Amino acid sequence: MEMAKANGWAVVCTSTNTNTVPIYSKYTRCTELRRVDDNDIYKLATILDVNGCWRKLMSIIPKRLDAQACSAPGALNYQEIAAKVGLKYTAQQISLIDGTAERLTPGQSISQVMIDEWKTSGKLNERPTVGVLLQLLVHAEIYSAADFVALHFLNEPKPERPTDGPAAHISLDLCSEDLSEDMDVEDGASYQPNTSALNAAVEQARGTGMNLDYFDKHMVRRDKSVPQQLENGTSSTVPVPPPRAARSSRLLKATASNVAPTTASNAPSASNTANVPNLSILNASSKKLAASSEQTLQPQNIPNLSILNGSSEAVLMATTSTTLDAGKSDNASNGRSSASTSTATIPNVPLITLLIENSSCEISDASDATQITSKSTATKTVPDMSTASYNNLPAISALNLNIASGAGELDGNGAKARGDNADNNSSGTNSLSNDDDEQKEDDDDDDDDDVVDVDDEEADVSLPNLSNSDHNDSSLTTVTCTSGENSFEFTNDSSSASNDDYTNNIPNLSELQQ
């Protein structure tokens, strides 16, 4: 009675004395659902959410029901009432409740929404009670929710279930007697396998490889360098990679390819410099240079002009002398007398006597390099082989005379000495002989003629331009040549500003073959 007053009940159930609620129960069967705590409604709603049980409960609620009269146990005759008054909720209304699930907050349940709607509907006597809820759950065979209401709301025993069917009770407890009967095993039973049978089964399973939890993996090592036997019986050959060149050889090839263009580009300059006489060994006063020049190889930088004359036979090499005068100039080059000694090889002095047409020249060695003669003599004897050769170069060192008797004289018609400013070391003569067959007899008869006729154009070309030498201090060289009664001067500018290359120092070979 006090519990009913506390929950707001206006009328107390007075049907019979047996329906009295125990004093310690939380709710009575006549307690309206709107008076039940929200926490208890929430727990009940979580059970009804399983498998959509709330739809089954909502579909069997009667339309008009005297809740207070039907709250007692067994007082609700559902079949008669449902046929008389009908159902309260239709399928469309159930779908509306189902549509609210999308708008629910995380703490709400759709079954709770259904209970909230049901407990607040109807008149005073038509509002649902805990007793009506328990009887409808049993009629809908939702026994899990019915057990929760009987135990937690009313403190009553669980409602009875049918003995058969899905709603029948399923016991999960095992009786000790039943368990002992199931666990009894005879010692001499034939179905118990022995050790030999177990080992045989293991061996059989190992052979078939069936139902193995683990297995041993044995790796077979193979030497890949040895050809393996194939299935068809033939042996496969091991592929051998091609030999690879060593790193050092590849570097050498790369270096050679890089050096080759440089060598080719430097070749023209080397050919030009090799054709210039090495004037550093022309100083006869240095004995060291003379000795070293004898040991070096003879550079064949001057063409062998003696073989260019097809009409001449074996030409003997010698040195001829022709009077030359150094031009008057402060920078005039030192005059030198060419008296080169010949060895077995062809001398390096161009055979200018071959330049005259139809000439068959024979060059004789001058016996004395310091003697200035007005008559060129030709001998047919081979020069002394023991004479020292300065690298097959013109014996220009003989022009630097250190003796006092080496004063230069010029003989000829109208030839006059112009070396007044030259000392003994800078004075000298360069004798050139260019006699043809027709002039030999005239030269023998005329002893007064000291100078041999030389063609002007050929002499200019054939004379070596020694002013291009690195050791020649003179940048301007003037040479005076005498031909018969005429004399002419040849000036060669070898200054650093000149554009002449070394090729101007080589005789014009196109004019040699006449």
From Swiss-Prot:
It comes from the Eukaryota. GO terms for cellular component: cytoplasm. GO terms for biological process: signal transduction. Residues 259-274 have a biased composition (Low complexity). The keyword Repeat applies. Residues 226-250, 255-274, 324-343, 366-385, 413-514 are annotated as: Disordered. Keywords: Cytoplasm, Developmental protein, Repeat, Transducer. Its main location: cytoplasm. Residues 434-460 have a biased composition (Acidic residues). Required for the determination of embryonic dorsoventral polarity. Is involved in transduction of information regulating nuclear import of dorsal protein. This is Protein Tube. It comes from Drosophila virilis. The gene is tub.
